Amino acid sequence: MSTTKTSSETMSNYRWIICSMLFFATAVNYLDRQVLSLTWKDFIAPEFHWTDTHYGTITAIFSIIYAIANLFAGRFVDWLGSKKGYLWAIAIWSLGACLHALCGWATEMSLRLKDVNEMIAASGALTSTIAITSVYYFIAARIVLAVGESGNFPAAIKVTAEYFPKKDRAFATSIFNAGSTIGALIAPVSIPPLASYFKSIGVGNGWEMAFIVIGALGFIWMGLWMFLYKKPNVNPRVNAAELEYIEQDNNNPEESAEQQAAANDFDNKKISFLQCFKFPQTWAVFVGKFMTDGVWWFFLFWTPAYISDVYGFASDTGTAQMLIFVLYAITMLSIYGGKLPTIIINKTGKNPYAARMQAMLIFALFPLLALFAQPLGNYSYWYPIMIIGIAG
């Protein structure tokens, strides 16, 4: 009776609402990360007398802390669970984003300067003192941001595993991962104008409110997450048909009860951190991320400054915003890339793991295109923009 009812019932699609929340969180994650790269050259550097070295130091430490925090973020999310783990992660990084806005005030107080105008007008040895002091404060805020942001992808992947069967997880992952592209896409057309607007009305130097406004988006997400998220088996918005679809990997008619029990035991088995390194999959992901993430983050952090220095377009000009927008618009192709493993499965009958590996091999060739960005940039600024977009 129950089987007939489930099969004839129209399936709800609440899993896609959850996926949209993951998308939103990832977009906010990248928005918060981009505020500094889009404001430092034209808004922050004149105030604190920064050079490329100062900014590079901040981004390097952020990247190191983010990498270290990632080692523990997954365990933290497993310990707290998807709901609380995600809430804590986004609360920490949103707080970190907002803390950036206090760095100017903290620098003034530390050096006993009257106001921002005295800081901008400083000369001689004082400029170096201002730069170094402010860098320390920005590093502190950046560390908080990095620790919080490290929890986004482990939490999102855990939720995806809870709400999607194995055959759909790559596509769902590509959708929420596209939030990083959307966040980066929205950033150049929202953050510099925000900073310019608040500067024009006399609210600080403008960049402070950009950090606060963008950081506040995370707190809005937290309210929605508390209301919307429950595990699918206890969520009243997930009907029986959808729950059966989500749990189809646990109800494979081609497997015996013993095989299913063994598979469930393996999936639920907890292993130590060091034991993870015994699996070749761990090393494959580690090496893959090591080889690609550094390149992507380099483009993420430095492209706005590259456009400003090489082509003379400040971050708040229409041309600069258009160039960054087009770059990240091209990376939106990643959504369709997530569908490739499903296409391979349907056409070849390969298992999900083999299909994902084949798709990853194809995508691994794309970053090589970035080698042509700099030499072709001598002919037109459009070449590096398009090439970096495709490589990303």
Regions inferred by a protein language model and the residue ranges of each:
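Helix-loop-helix hairpin linking two adjacent transmembrane segments in secondary transporters
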Residues: F176, S180-P236
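Residue-level signature of mid-helix packing/kink "hotspots" within the transmembrane helices
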Residues: Q34, S63-L71, S150, A184-L185, ...
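Extracytoplasmic
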Residues: I17-D52, T107, F299-P304
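C-terminal ends and interior cores of transmembrane alpha-helices
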Residues: A91-A131, L361-N378
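Primarily marks hydrophobic transmembrane alpha-helices of the MFS/SLC 12-helix fold
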Residues: Y86, F138, M357-M360
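Extracellular/periplasmic helix-loop-helix junction of adjacent transmembrane segments
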Residues: S37-I68, L113-Y136
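Extracytoplasmic gate region of multi-pass secondary transporters
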Residues: L36-K41, L274-I335
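Cytoplasmic helix-loop-helix junction between adjacent transmembrane helices
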Residues: Y137, A141-S180
